């Protein structure tokens, strides 16, 4: 029976609003538009595949205006780099060969920038044909301008005469790859329409599929990021009512949905990193408003990772304990705190100092980032107990009792000498910290120092950047008994992103950090854990290598089925509860 098109828009409009809500939430996927003959175009297969997979396609026109690009990315949950013309070899530092086909300068600059800016924001990316080449070029890889003249050996046909929705050759997939998980096969029939290809994969990526003649057909991130590229055109198959390539698009929608949900969570809660050492780089001329490769925390990276606040510490290396050396340590602590305040003042429209949990809420509502002040190593106060109150009046929210060396307050985990705990002076310091409202931090403290501090303190104490010794036997980590004792007194332990505290052998990744967190939750309870990255103090691991990647930690928490309330507690709720209790007079 034939149905005829109706032209009653009012009826359709009314039908949309017969129930509430009238739509389902879905991730918004940006698709790069082609540009030819003065028009922005996009082949049907791209947006149809995104729609069929459950996403909302949003076409990004080839514009040069940077502000437009960034605002577009901030509205997106995923990015699909589409196919099209050759890439101008000048962007890769090469001269064109005579076999180069047409190029599209309007697209090249925009898409290379889009790929890098999207990756900074941890936006899931899928590259198709030209798109995989754009990804590779953007991150430092190389391309063949023409595989037929620049690759050794014979080539199979890579520009098929068959219809676009039909396979013309096969690719072999690596069994340990994401692509294999999606298709569950080593041999995959694909279509092919290209003469350029990836030559050497960019750092941070690996080859996951090749054609029989050795051409790279797929690559993926080796840094636990949602980034994948394929050389064929999976979007063409759906137009032949063939769903064989839909796993690629389902992957993009799944990753983008996770990213979208993580962004929403961050918008509804305070996210706090309880420990970073960025001031250690102040003498290298860094600018907090510049995205600086030397540091892991700056305004750009905080915004990209959706991090609201960080506690920057004045770190003091443990040196001699002579009167002169102690006086110099106190002066250095003051100088570093001054430098933090000056850095914030220079960027006062975007960031401010927070002294209390209430300040954090106020600054988030104002659209500003927050920096809190800390001191790493009680060496800073010398032997002068009055420095505790003076530093508290400066706004210091916590002080780590010691660092990698014994001091006049307590014994360090670095040496963990038997019987060396909190000294008589150290007991006075802890009690004074309780009195003035400064949190006691026992990261770096030896085991006896830990238990002594727990016994002496009348307020809950924190471990601002420590992990679980049961999973990584390092003296800086806390045993299960220590974790239980800390929780019993209302304290909090913050998982550290330093690789050496997460695993003994091999390279640590975000998966290891999640395992430590899960273990600590099981031992302590959800009300006693948090995140203290130690960024710029040797913290930073694959998958969570800077403040820009902290949104990935939230995505992992969602994958582990943590509730929104649990994630809120992990992301600072627990730590700020202790801060409020300690600061309460």
Can you name each region flagged by the protein language model?
Residues 352-353, 438-445:
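Catalytic beta/alpha-barrel core
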Residues 27-28, 56, 124, 142, ...:
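Proline-centered loop/turn at the N-terminus of a beta-strand
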Residues 261-418, 473-494, 498-531, 535-585:
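N-terminal hydrophobic targeting/anchoring segments and the immediately downstream early-domain regions
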Residues 192-197, 230-234, 271-278, 396, ...:
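Histidine-centered catalytic micro-motifs
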Residues 224, 306-307, 396-398, 436-438, ...:
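Glycine-enriched alpha-helix->loop->beta-strand junction motifs that scaffold or abut catalytic
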Residues 1-128, 137, 144, 148-182, ...:
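N-terminal beta1-alpha1 cap of cysteine-dependent amidohydrolase-like domains
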Residues 420-433:
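Active-site glycine-rich loop that binds ribose-phosphate moieties when present
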